[in-house]
Curated annotation (Swiss-Prot):
Catalytic activity: a 1,2-diacyl-sn-glycero-3-phospho-(1D-myo-inositol-5-phosphate) + ATP = a 1,2-diacyl-sn-glycero-3-phospho-(1D-myo-inositol-4,5-bisphosphate) + ADP + H(+); 1,2-dihexadecanoyl-sn-glycero-3-phospho-(1D-myo-inositol-5-phosphate) + ATP = 1,2-dihexadecanoyl-sn-glycero-3-phospho-(1D-myo-inositol-4,5-bisphosphate) + ADP + H(+); 1,2-dihexadecanoyl-sn-glycero-3-phospho-(1D-myo-inositol-5-phosphate) + GTP = 1,2-dihexadecanoyl-sn-glycero-3-phospho-(1D-myo-inositol-4,5-bisphosphate) + GDP + H(+)
Function statement: Phosphatidylinositol 5-phosphate 4-kinase with low enzymatic activity. May be a GTP sensor, has higher GTP-dependent kinase activity than ATP-dependent kinase activity. PIP4Ks negatively regulate insulin signaling through a catalytic-independent mechanism. They interact with PIP5Ks and suppress PIP5K-mediated PtdIns(4,5)P2 synthesis and insulin-dependent conversion to PtdIns(3,4,5)P3.
Enzyme Commission numbers on file: 2.7.1.149
Protein name: Phosphatidylinositol 5-phosphate 4-kinase type-2 gamma
Source organism per UniProt: Bos taurus
Subunit structure: Interacts with PIP5K1A; the interaction inhibits PIP5K1A kinase activity.
Any one GO MF annotation of this record: 1-phosphatidylinositol-4-phosphate 5-kinase activity
Gene3D superfamilies linked to this entry: 2-Layer Sandwich, Phosphatidylinositol Phosphate Kinase II Beta
Pfam families noted in UniProt: PIP5K (PF01504)
Positions of the UniProt region annotated as Required for interaction with PIP5K1A: 69-75
Subcellular location per the Swiss-Prot or TrEMBL entry: Endoplasmic reticulum; Cytoplasm
List of residues that carry N-acetylalanine: 2
Compositional bias per record (Basic and acidic residues), positions renumbered to this chain: 294-304
Amino acid sequence: MASSSVPPTAVPAATAAPGAGFGFASKTKKKHFVQQKVKVFRAADPLVGVFLWGVAHSINELSQVPPPVMLLPDDFKASSKIKVNNHLFHRENLPSHFKFKEYCPQVFRNLRDRFGIDDQDYLVSLTRSPPTESEGSDGRFLISYDRTLVIKEVSSEDIADMHSNLSNYHQYIVKCHGNTLLPQFLGMYRVSVDSEDSYMLVMRNMFSHRLPVHRKYDLKGSLVSREASDKEKVKELPTLKDMDFLNKNQKVYIGEEEKKVFLEKLKRDVEFLVQLKIMDYSLLLGIHDIIRGSEPEEDGPVREEESEGDGDCGLTGPPAPVGSYGTSPEGIGGYIHSHRPLGPGEFESFIDVYAIRSAEGAPQKEVYFMGLIDILTQYDAKKKAAHAAKTVKHGAGAEISTVHPEQYAKRFLDFITNIFA
């Protein structure tokens, strides 16, 4: 038996006519789908199963009402919840007791729209096939089957930080028209299974969904303890750091105009982070080698369209909703197949939004993926204590990672400006 508790600002359409009690305009954006029933997913991992079931439930609920004309302060505090008990009919697919909560559903709906992501494509990318586990330094890290979205398990403290900064983040995205190197936050959820809470943050994948990354760096502009460990370096795709970048004489070869646009965007984003007293962020740099990428790989990963069955998770998603033009959403990266075929190193900039191709005449034919990550750390008492401890250990002049937000930003920008050839 399912029971849901939803605040007045998010009354489900089952209990109110679309738009009733809301300040919504009668005219809405054209949607290419018809409403589907929530499908039940089957997953070996109960957490993943409940998460995907909850996302489908949430998107279906949101599709019942038009988006608000403007977001109100209450939208940044709102949440929608559903609690399911004695779910015996689907006990082989889902736990018999679970809870699912979406934070600020209207805000993230608006953010998805501003980032050019349709809700039904978002749903398909997340749920048509099971997400796969990926290596993440902190907590669990999943990637959607079409590789356009990442699902990061975060702490309750991260959720609290996101909550406190969400209004500022949304305002900034509106101001810059979504043209940013910041992470594109698309959804924030809590999943409760066996009385344990897990918190999930969904973001756009900064790397390409079709061009594999052959090298990657996490750059902070600090040189102390900023070299990948021997254990990290033996991985198939290690996360290298600042000292590795310098020791390898690595450079980023992009055109002057692309460099100018990138640095202007970076400076604007970093100024925003300084205003919020945020630090410890990194530039994530992924490098796709076009020559290597065009060579067939003997033991490369099997692409979704080539594989049979539903994979180890056994996850079954909903059929794609039928569109008003007789089409079905194909996920965030799906529409690329209806356009011209892409050659080696080519990409669609509206999907691979963090990608820049190397300049003509560059010594290496490469595609670079560059974006800011780990932007939730604010300068607080813990950081102040860590800074004091590192100053004692390394000396006041050392290039240590924990400094004041303004110092961090200056050092970070100085370093990133010099990664270009």
